[in-house]
Structure formats: structure tokens, C-alpha cells
Regions:
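Outer-membrane beta-barrel domain signature
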Residues: 43-56, 62, 110-118, 122-124, ...
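Structured core elements
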Residues: 91-93, 107-109, 148
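Outer-membrane beta-barrel "beta-signal"
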Residues: 138-145, 149, 158-170
């Protein structure tokens, strides 16, 4: 959890209120058996202030790795690149991974989120946007690191996409 205030003169941002950013992230995993793992996550980021947010602060959603392209990027299944989002963004994710052979795994993953121009409107369906994404993946654990391929879809892209990865994420 973090909170930041952005100004351009220690008091204001562009002759308006300073920009406040509240950011919360939580991720956990558990293994009910030696071959099955459940990973769950929750991300939330809320901006408040003048409403004219610079690119370096504005919320971004998409990709598989948090903060890969911009520090404020929140991962989302089915959106394969970082996209701009509104001022209030909440995302929950779930990944079910099963080991099928010694070094081979399959995954089923999903994300659900809501975004809105203001935090107090995020549960109001007329003022916010529902986001949903699903995916399936295969991973091989090689001696050089994991090799992964994923097929995914979201109601934001409205098409099947894919992601391929090789190596560890640091």
C-alpha cells in the first residue's frame, strides 16, 4: 500500500489541487496439492486532484507483469499491452496452474476489474466500466528458465490474443 502527492511547486499542480495517488497491491498463492497451485491477486489505484493527469502518473492496465512498461501498470488477462485507464481502477486476478508432467504445466487464468473517472462512482454501473478477461496457457520449465505461451481474450479487446514468454521475471 502506498500514497503519493504530486505537485509542481510544493503546493499545487498546474495552478490546481495537487494530485494524490493511492495504490494497493496484494498477491498470494497456495498449493492444495503438490501438483496444483492457486495464485490470486488484487490491485487498486486511485488518482484524485485536478483531473488533468500527466502520462507518468495516469493509470495503466494490461500485460502479464505488474509495472513492466510503467511503474503504475496493473496486469490484466486478455489485454496484452499497457493501455490507459481512468482515475479509479480496481482489478482482481486468479490463476489455476496444474503440473501435468515433470516440467510441464497448464494454466487457466482470469481477471475482473472496474474503472471509473472517480472512486465513489466505481460501483455505479452507469458511471464505470466492467472489464473481464480469461486465458489458458502452457509452460515448460527448462534449464534456462520457463517457456510460456498463452491464449487470451477480454471484453476490452474483443478478440483472441496471445502472449509468449521466455526466462525468469526479475
Amino acid at each position: 500500500v502506498s500514497y503519493h502527492v504530486y505537485t509542481d511547486n510544493f503546493f499545487q499542480y498546474k495552478d490546481n489541487n495537487p494530485i494524490s495517488v493511492f495504490d494497493a497491491r496484494w498477491q498470494g498463492c497456495f498449493s492444495p496439492s503438490s501438483k496444483f497451485t492457486v495464485t490470486h491477486s488484487f490491485y487498486g489505484r486511485v488518482l484524485s486532484g485536478s483531473g488533468n493527469y500527466p502520462f507518468a502518473i495516469i493509470n495503466m492496465v494490461g500485460g502479464t507483469i505488474p509495472g513492466r512498461y510503467m511503474p503504475q501498470q496493473i496486469p490484466f488477462t486478455g489485454i496484452n499491452r499497457a493501455e490507459l485507464s481512468q482515475a479509479a481502477l480496481l482489478v482482481a486476478g486468479l490463476n489455476l496452474r496444474q503440473r501435468i508432467l515433470k516440467n510441464q504445466y497448464i494454466s487457466v487464468m482470469g481477471s475482473y476489474g472496474r474503472n471509473s473517472g472517480k472512486f465513489h462512482q466505481i460501483l455505479d454501473s452507469s458511471e464505470s466500466v466492467d472489464m473481464a478477461g480469461v486465458g489458458i496457457g502452457y509452460m515448460y520449465k527448462s534449464f534456462l528458465g520457463p517457456v510460456e505461451i498463452q491464449l487470451n481474450w477480454s471484453n476490452q479487446t474483443k478478440k483472441v490474443g496471445w502472449y509468449a514468454g521466455f526466462g525468469f521475471v526479475f
